[in-house]
């Protein structure tokens, strides 16, 4: 993304910072940060629609056969529509802000199409413990239907996030890129999983669009920060036929719609004040 506009205004003893981000598909993401003298920050975000046509990607017949699943053709057609994996914001806190308390679904990780077995409640954990060590690192540790989140050190001031409506979140000791980025580690492509035609061509630029580089659980080590992802919505996991199916339509996020959501950041002296901070409507 890139910032296309940023303006600041002062009103009622508060300062509003309005930032417009242009996303790769042509959507605008407009975020307004209203900052009060007591440190409270109200965040309101709007995602605008786009009708930009997706780019068609050619896939070899060998790859189609190697990745065949029941309904795979329908899944490919569905995947050709512009969708958004998640809509939200992310920020980082010092590693000392490792203690996490939240009012949402838990204690296990859960997603919008994988959450009926988790109960809504108030849970206490740490960013370290929220990590789920999949053998192949990937998205993990998400929690849905969340009302508020408190992050704090063992002693001292903390931060409470109060949602305007139900949100999802991750709070982990790694970045998104650590788990699911081609550039996370300089591992080679696993060419034995490619078709003979693709192996013969040995085109690394083409390979990244077929089978991504793989890294493993032993490649993940905690960073010196806590990365917090706050999502209006993250699309479902899918995979109802074992591994290949797309999420159901109501668990997807079409890019041709507008979305608006928000939350408020409230500084507190300790995580024990989370319940009190969450009582108020900051909008």
Predicted regions and their residues:
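Beta-strand/loop-rich accessory regions of lumenal/periplasmic or secreted enzymes
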Residues: 1-283
């Amino acid at each position: 993304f890139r910032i296309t506009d940023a303006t600041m205004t002062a009103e009622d003893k508060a300062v509003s910072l309005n930032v417009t981000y242009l996303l790769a598909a042509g959507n605008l993401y407009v975020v307004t940060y209203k900052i009060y003298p007591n440190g409270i920050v109200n965040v309101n975000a709007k995602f605008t629609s786009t009708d930009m046509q997706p780019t068609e990607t050619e896939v070899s017949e060998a790859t189609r056969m190697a990745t065949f699943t029941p309904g795979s053709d329908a899944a490919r057609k569905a995947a050709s529509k512009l969708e958004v994996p998640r809509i939200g914001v992310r920020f980082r806190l010092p590693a000392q802000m490792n203690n996490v308390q939240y009012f949402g679904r838990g204690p296990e990780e859960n997603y919008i199409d994988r959450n009926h077995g988790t109960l809504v409640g108030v849970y206490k954990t740490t960013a370290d413990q929220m990590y789920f060590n999949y053998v192949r690192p990937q998205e993990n540790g998400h929690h849905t239907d969340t009302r508020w989140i408190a992050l704090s050190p063992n002693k001292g001031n903390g931060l409470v996030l109060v949602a305007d409506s139900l949100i999802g979140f991750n709070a982990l000791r790694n970045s998104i890129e650590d788990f699911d980025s081609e550039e996370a580690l300089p591992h080679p492509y696993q060419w034995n999983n490619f078709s003979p035609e693709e192996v013969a061509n040995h085109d690394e630029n083409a390979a990244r669009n077929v089978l991504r580089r793989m890294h493993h659980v032993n490649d993940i080590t905690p960073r010196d920060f806590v990365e917090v992802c706050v999502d209006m919505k993250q699309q479902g996991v899918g995979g109802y036929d074992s591994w290949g199916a797309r999420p159901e339509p109501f668990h997807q996020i079409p890019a041709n719609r507008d979305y608006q959501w928000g939350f408020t950041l409230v500084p507190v002296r300790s995580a024990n004040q989370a319940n009190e901070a969450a009582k108020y409507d900051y909008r």
